[in-house]
């Protein structure tokens, strides 16, 4: 059996948004209208089709991005529902990596919220074309044009409405299509009574004004259209659509549409927009990769004729079939039962079965083609970000980069039986989620788990209990501090031991200097004339890397420094790799007195939404937590305070905000950057870590 849908008629899209903007409901409705679901599940009743892990149904938020296939007007649409909660940014990163386009869902009352900014930035990094869907037009305080304004102000994005709502809040009962110059009126909230009519008289003037603005914005990006526009010629619907499509797929323009997924309004037009304006796998640039042995760069085009290549973007453990590996096929064809090469790990893998996923049911298929998204059963060594490819034509596609965890807690099993199971559970969970780490603290022997935030770790512990039946006690959260150097110095490290028999000798001079923020550790060899033999130089680098894991001030990892090996000496008989490793770590310890080491802490971008009367208390509270208020604005009848606050001061903030605002305030936070800790705090951290 050949391909069911051509590449032009395939769309791989993600649905991304801030928590509670309604994107799971939007996805549900898409599945409903494309004939994949027979009854609609409401998120707030805990029965949504996409949210299928137990915790998601309880909490009403989406944690794992489920990949689902739907069909609309002769097109196949593969949808990945991504979580909007900041602790799960890794899920969003992974999804964006394998998508061709995305729908950003906004809440019509709030517009762009902090998590929207984060996800938008991630999508820009990966060059993903987007449509913006302003959802919840039926909500009190819904304001379409305000929401569009926030896209310009907060995201600096070239976004323009291609629709306008008719009415808002309870009165929201239609949508004007500016491209086709018509309107859709809704007779009820079930989406069963929709009529295409002329634009109502009272809305004509506004519609004309916004259609003019739309044509102008698109013409600016299209020379031919610009000429016609300037000469006053009529621009046809087809030309306008083609112009919008071209500008959207080249990520220069973002069409904005509106609706209410919950009330079944605007969903079909959203699907039309996905097909009209988002790219097919043929519209996006060919993916680049490198050939493992030669490091030469190669391209893989989206075509069934090319050699097979795919990227594994998600691992899940399924109670019935075991380990599922979700992958996106970039080129070629794969049959179930065949062998592929995991070129990242250099391992051969057998693809047992291939499943096409619907939110929580699955359909077995025998072949996947270029542009498809599917899940494989039977892969043993493959983890997130690995490349799978044809054994005869190896390639490694660019992998994904994941942020380092910012928060950790100690965890201990409640009983001996739990202890054995806990190791397995943690290994499986960290395989699924690259931003979750588990390790044993060498000094205390405790098991430490680290992740992107309190909710992230809560859910991990919860999953251990439910899926792996492990009961565990969790300690207080710890912040992932870092250390770095503020000044440069040249220091010596000398290790010489002579105690009968063969001695040990290693001697180095290393120049340390601060590196740019986020650049990590860089080691350079500047030895001339062989004063340290070449075979010992990697040992110096390795010795420094080991020593950097436990910093010099308070034992935190040292980041963002450069080290250059400039001089040293060796002994013909007594020198060894080990001796040079130790000498390098001695040099790092000696650098403490000279390089002005400091402690860095994670700073969180915090947004607090509160009724006006609590403004004073909240501002005072933020300042008392060493926070810097960076801006305030009114949103509807509430006030929004934006601030930068150290993570260490944010523990338990949810409880304190609840009591300060009688439960009427909400907040969200996202990791922003590392910053130097004030001296007084730094002294406390050092004291605490040295057990004084």
Curated annotation (Swiss-Prot):
GO terms for biological process: ribosome disassembly. One of its GO terms (molecular function) is translation elongation factor activity. Residues 8-282 form the tr-type G domain. Gene3D superfamilies: 3.30.230.10, 3.30.70.240, Elongation Factor G (Translational Gtpase), domain 3 (3.30.70.870), P-loop containing nucleotide triphosphate hydrolases (3.40.50.300), Translation factors (2.40.30.10). GO terms for cellular component: cytoplasm. Pfam families: EFG_C (PF00679), EFG_III (PF14492), EFG_IV (PF03764), GTP_EFTU (PF00009), GTP_EFTU_D2 (PF03144). GTP binds at residues 17-24, 81-85, 135-138. Keywords: Cytoplasm, Elongation factor, GTP-binding, Nucleotide-binding, Protein biosynthesis. It is found in: Cytoplasm. It comes from the Bacteria. Catalyzes the GTP-dependent ribosomal translocation step during translation elongation. During this step, the ribosome changes from the pre-translocational (PRE) to the post-translocational (POST) state as the newly formed A-site-bound peptidyl-tRNA and P-site-bound deacylated tRNA move to the P and E sites, respectively. Catalyzes the coordinated movement of the two tRNA molecules, the mRNA and conformational changes in the ribosome. Belongs to the TRAFAC class translation factor GTPase superfamily. Classic translation factor GTPase family. EF-G/EF-2 subfamily. This is Elongation factor G. It comes from Bacillus cereus (strain ATCC 10987 / NRS 248).
